[in-house]
């Protein structure tokens, strides 16, 4: 298990929100994908995974409602 800082960004364009909502969390995970599966079990396959050059793992689902999860290993 590894410890991650998780930054979750949520934006609902349909509701006319001008600014994204962000939350922060730390968690011990075997894999970041497990966290996404727990939060979005039915929609997991809609998320795109990206590994950034700095090592961050990003899962994003962009649509009328956008979810972006950034995992940084601590």
Where do the PLM segments sit?
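Short, mixed-charge low-complexity intrinsically disordered segments
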Residues: 41-74
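A short, charged, amphipathic alpha-helix used as a generic interaction element across diverse proteins
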Residues: 27-48
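A short beta-strand micro-motif
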Residues: 3-12
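Short, surface-exposed beta-strand/loop "edge" segments at domain boundaries and coil↔beta transitions
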Residues: 12-19, 64-70
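A short, exposed loop/beta-hairpin motif centered on an aromatic-Gly-Thr core
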Residues: 15-30
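A general secondary-structure signal for short beta-strands and their flanking turns/coil
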Residues: 1-3, 17
């Amino acid at each position: 298990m590894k410890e991650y800082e998780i930054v979750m960004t949520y934006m609902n364009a349909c509701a006319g929100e001008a600014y994204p909502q962000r939350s922060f969390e730390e968690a011990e995970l075997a894999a970041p994908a497990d966290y996404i599966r727990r939060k979005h079990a039915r929609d997991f396959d809609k998320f795109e995974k990206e590994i950034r050059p700095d090592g961050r793992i990003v899962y994003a689902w962009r649509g009328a409602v956008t979810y972006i999860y950034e995992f940084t290993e601590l």
